């Protein structure tokens, strides 16, 4: 929470239209407007961004079980659909330098968006249901 006010000031100073909060209950009202998401790397968040085709900057929680947040984000990074940063990158200035480069390259954001969409499987659960229902149960 301590970084929220700092981030808001930075965006305002640089005339970047943004919605900054620690949690959005009504994420659907915002995700369609976003050209870039900055968030943690939980699986639900990542899948929402993939399906929406929105490139993201992820800050995985260091102490997540099995380092799963980093592993989640790494799949997207390897597919050029997201960037990964550590919390230490905020204080060191690394993050702001990279963020400035990212947001001033619309073609890069467009490419990462395209790559996200290619990773998505929006009808996967429906397809799985169809496969399961099509299986013939045989008497043993």
Go through the PLM ranges and name each one.
Residues 1-39, 70-74, 78, 85-95:
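Donor-nucleotide binding loops and adjacent catalytic segments primarily
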Residues 2, 61-65, 89-90, 118:
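Short histidine/acidic/glycine/proline-rich micro-motifs that form metal-
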Residues 27-68:
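A donor-sugar binding/catalytic signature common to diverse glycosyltransferases
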Residues 56, 83-84:
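Hydrophobic beta-strand scaffold residues
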Residues 95, 99, 103, 128-132:
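Hydrophobic "lid"/C-terminal helical patch
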Residues 97-100, 108-111, 135-137:
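Catalytic machinery of carbohydrate-active enzymes
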Residues 108-122:
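A short, well-ordered alpha-helix in the C-terminal region of glycosyltransferases
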Residues 121-140:
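C-terminal alpha-helical cap of glycosyltransferases
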């Amino acid at each position: 929470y301590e970084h929220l006010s700092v981030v808001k000031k930075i965006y305002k100073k640089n005339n970047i239209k943004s919605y900054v909060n620690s949690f959005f209950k009504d994420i659907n009202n915002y995700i369609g407007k976003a050209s870039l998401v900055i968030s943690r790397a939980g699986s639900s968040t990542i899948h929402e961004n993939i399906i929406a085709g929105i490139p993201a900057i992820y800050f995985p929680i260091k102490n997540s079980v099995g380092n799963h947040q980093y592993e989640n984000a790494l799949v997207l990074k390897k597919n050029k659909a997201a960037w990964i940063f550590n919390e230490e990158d905020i204080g060191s200035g690394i993050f702001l330098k990279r963020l400035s480069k990212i947001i001033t390259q619309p073609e890069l954001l467009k490419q990462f968006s395209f790559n996200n969409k290619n990773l998505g499987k929006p009808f996967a659960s429906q397809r799985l249901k169809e496969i399961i229902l099509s299986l013939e149960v045989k008497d043993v």
